[in-house]
Each structure stands twice: as C-alpha cells, then as structure tokens.
C-alpha cells in the first residue's frame, strides 16, 4: 500500500461554499474509501457536532459515510475501522493536544503510511508535517510535543500570504518563516496559498490548484513553486 494524503491550505477560497473548491481534489481519494472518520479537535469555537454537520454538508455530493471521532467510545478503534481519515481546521495546538491525549499520533501515521487515505485542511494540514512549529495559530494549550504526524517530512504553512496591510507594523508571514529557518536551516517549509493543496501519492508529491506555493529553507526565502510542480524531492 502507498501513502495517499491530500493536504489542503483551507476549507474555502474567497466566498465559496464550505469545502466546495476542494471536491475535485478530494474525489480521487474516495474511489475505494466510503467510510470516513472526521477528527474535529481543532474546532475550539464550535461544538464537535456542529463541526461534523458542516463537513457532512460540504461533502454531501460525494455521498460518503462520515462520522465524528467524538461519537465513538474508542477513538483508536474508530481510526482503525475507517476507510479514510479527515482532519479539519481550527486551532493546531488544541488539535495536536487532543491527538496526544487519545494516543492517536502514532496510530494515524501508521494507518496513513500503510495506505489509508488522509485528507486535512488548515490545522489538519499543519499536523501532517514534521511538527507544528510553523502554524499561524495562537498557542492556547500546550501539547506534550510539537512533533506531528510526519506524513510529509517537512514543515507546512497553510493559508500562506505575505500581504501587509497599510500602516500595520507587525511581521509578515515571510518574516515569521524566516525566523524558523534561522533556527532550523535544514528543514524546508512549504507555504500553501488558499485554494491550493499538496497531494502525496506514494513517493510522488504534487501541487494542486491555481496558485503557486512558496518554499523557505536556509538561505532560500519565499521561492515560488509553480502550479503543477513535482515536489517529490521534498519527500527524500
């Protein structure tokens, strides 16, 4: 079995309906996977039931059987029984805290590396990398470790944008990622713009969508990655 993981930057593009832009990206992963488990742990400002309902509605045209992990008495068994794993956005620190709390980090990695499809967006993409050290989120809770799922062996920065509002004096996203590369100059960071996604199929990694991504690594800063690029070298 080979890895089949889709890492979406966001759940929306502009004013589009929830997850609608991602349907063409998601559909190929559902060909042989009907029963999906949704992990809503990043959703801090809403109930898990509300979050689940929005995902079910957003993906309704795919006619999938989606349940929330919070509905199952044994979260680990729920992961094992599912055909595929969905992890939504929200607060990455809270998400990873709960994954460690229920002893799911190593299990999810094992299942995905053995071929179980994985779809994450925003925080769900953040945790697919080596660690969550390049998330945009506020550290509202402290997980036991920043080490994440390592489905891809580099860092991700979803919702990437280097826009600076006029008159704003805070750091840009590029400046924040530069700080990371000063501390860890050998680990690549891929910034994925809203509407874009990374798709890992075995030892192949490609960029989907209509916008470039951006690479940060050591002295290389904000290097554009053209749409459709083969990024398989980042898996080495």
UniProtKB/Swiss-Prot annotation:
Keyword Cytoplasm found: yes
UniProt keyword annotations, A-Z: Cytoplasm, Dipeptidase, Hydrolase, Protease, Serine protease
Main location: cytoplasm
UniProt-recorded Gene Ontology molecular function terms: dipeptidase activity; serine-type peptidase activity
Catalytic activity: Dipeptidase E catalyzes the hydrolysis of dipeptides Asp-|-Xaa. It does not act on peptides with N-terminal Glu, Asn or Gln, nor does it cleave isoaspartyl peptides
Cellular component GO terms held in the UniProt record: cytoplasm
Gene Ontology BP term (one): proteolysis
Active site: 122, 137, 159
E.C. numbers: 3.4.13.21
The organism's place on the tree of life at top rank: Bacteria
Gene3D superfamilies in the cross-refs: 3.40.50.880
Subcellular location: Cytoplasm
Similarity comment: Belongs to the peptidase S51 family.
Task performed by this protein: Hydrolyzes dipeptides containing N-terminal aspartate residues. May play a role in allowing the cell to use peptide aspartate to spare carbon otherwise required for the synthesis of the aspartate family of amino acids.
Protein name (database record): Peptidase E
The species this protein was found in: Shewanella sp. (strain MR-4)
């Amino acid at each position: 079995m080979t890895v089949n993981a889709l890492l979406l930057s966001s759940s929306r593009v502009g004013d589009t309906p929830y997850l609608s832009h991602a349907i063409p990206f998601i559909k190929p992963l559902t060909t042989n996977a009907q029963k999906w488990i949704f992990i809503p742990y990043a959703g801090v400002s809403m109930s898990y039931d509300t979050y689940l309902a929005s995902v079910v509605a957003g993906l309704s045209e795919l006619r999938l059987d989606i349940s929330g992990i919070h509905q199952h008495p044994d979260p680990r068994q729920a992961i094992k029984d599912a055909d595929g794993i969905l992890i939504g956005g929200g607060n990455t620190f809270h998400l990873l805290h709960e994954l460690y709390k229920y002893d799911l980090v190593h299990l999810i990695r094992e299942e995905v590396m053995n071929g179980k499809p994985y779809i994450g967006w925003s925080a769900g993409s953040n945790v697919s990398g080596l660690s969550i050290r390049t998330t945009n989120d506020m550290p509202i809770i402290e997980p036991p470790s920043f080490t994440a799922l390592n489905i891809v062996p580099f860092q991700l920065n979803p919702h990437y944008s280097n826009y600076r509002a006029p008159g704003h004096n805070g750091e840009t996203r590029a400046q924040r990622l530069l700080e990371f590369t000063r501390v860890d100059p050998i680990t690549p960071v891929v910034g994925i713009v809203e509407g874009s996604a990374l798709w890992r199929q075995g030892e192949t990694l490609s960029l989907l969508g209509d916008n470039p991504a951006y690479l940060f690594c050591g002295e290389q800063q904000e290097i554009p990655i053209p749409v459709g690029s083969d990024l398989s070298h980042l898996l080495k």
